[in-house]
């Protein structure tokens, strides 16, 4: 199998990001964004996906974490899409239900080339998690789905602790990505012959 890997760099007035990704890795992850909770969530995602991931971001966290989180999601998504290449042979669809103590999240996705996000249950999240607005994480998932060109459904089913809910979501996303990216056939899984 061809090595499925990509490197992405992106520099704006808000963030400077350097990222390398190997889809079929060993779960070796190093994330440094200047925002500890983001590092924690992206490390979980990479580990549960089985990615080898190195991501560094120098962002305007003196404002807040918004640009850092959003741009990290976009770059990670772009790297994932690039690494998969023509997507021939992948399972394409993946899902996972992951508990974290009292919290449970379901993640379903399709590597369809048609980016879309459905993010349900975020009313369960407290207004602030790790010092930032809870809706920041919707922006991460939206940016990731757009960059990766995937249809992504995340349902926070129940739970009381915002950290636990998000942790179950990131673990679930990693596991669903691992399943969807798995090589299972030779041909493209599409009756129309294209994933665009």
From Swiss-Prot:
GO terms for biological process: L-histidine biosynthetic process. GO terms for molecular function: imidazoleglycerol-phosphate dehydratase activity. It catalyses: D-erythro-1-(imidazol-4-yl)glycerol 3-phosphate = 3-(imidazol-4-yl)-2-oxopropyl phosphate + H2O. Its main location: cytoplasm. GO terms for cellular component: cytoplasm. Its EC number is 4.2.1.19. Keywords: Amino-acid biosynthesis, Cytoplasm, Histidine biosynthesis, Lyase. SUPFAM superfamilies: Ribosomal protein S5 domain 2-like. Signal peptide: none annotated. It is found in: Cytoplasm. Pathway: Amino-acid biosynthesis; L-histidine biosynthesis; L-histidine from 5-phospho-alpha-D-ribose 1-diphosphate: step 6/9. It is an enzyme of class 4 (lyase). NCBIfam families: PRK00951.2-1 (NF002111), PRK00951.2-4 (NF002114). Belongs to the imidazoleglycerol-phosphate dehydratase family. PANTHER family: IMIDAZOLEGLYCEROL-PHOSPHATE DEHYDRATASE, IMIDAZOLEGLYCEROL-PHOSPHATE DEHYDRATASE HIS7. This is Imidazoleglycerol-phosphate dehydratase. It comes from Oleidesulfovibrio alaskensis (strain ATCC BAA-1058 / DSM 17464 / G20).
């Amino acid at each position: 199998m061809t090595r499925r890997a990509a490197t992405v760099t992106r520099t704006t007035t808000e963030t400077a990001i350097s990222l390398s990704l190997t889809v079929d890795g060993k779960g070796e992850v190093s994330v440094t964004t200047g925002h500890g909770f983001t590092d924690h969530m992206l490390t979980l995602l990479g580990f549960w996906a089985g990615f080898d991931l190195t991501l560094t971001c120098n962002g305007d966290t003196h404002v807040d974490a918004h640009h850092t989180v959003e741009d990290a999601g976009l770059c990670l998504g772009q790297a994932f899409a690039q690494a998969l290449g023509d997507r021939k042979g992948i399972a394409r669809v993946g899902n996972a239900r992951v508990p974290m103590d009292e919290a449970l999240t379901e993640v379903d996705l399709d590597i369809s080339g048609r980016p879309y996000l459905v993010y349900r249950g975020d009313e369960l999240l407290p207004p602030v998690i790790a010092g930032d607005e809870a809706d920041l994480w919707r922006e991460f998932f939206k940016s990731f789905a757009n960059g990766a060109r995937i249809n992504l459904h995340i349902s926070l089913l129940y739970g009381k602790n915002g950290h636990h809910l998000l942790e179950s979501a990131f673990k679930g996303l990693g596991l669903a990505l691992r399943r969807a990216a798995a090589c299972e056939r030779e041909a493209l899984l599409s009756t129309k012959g294209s994933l665009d």
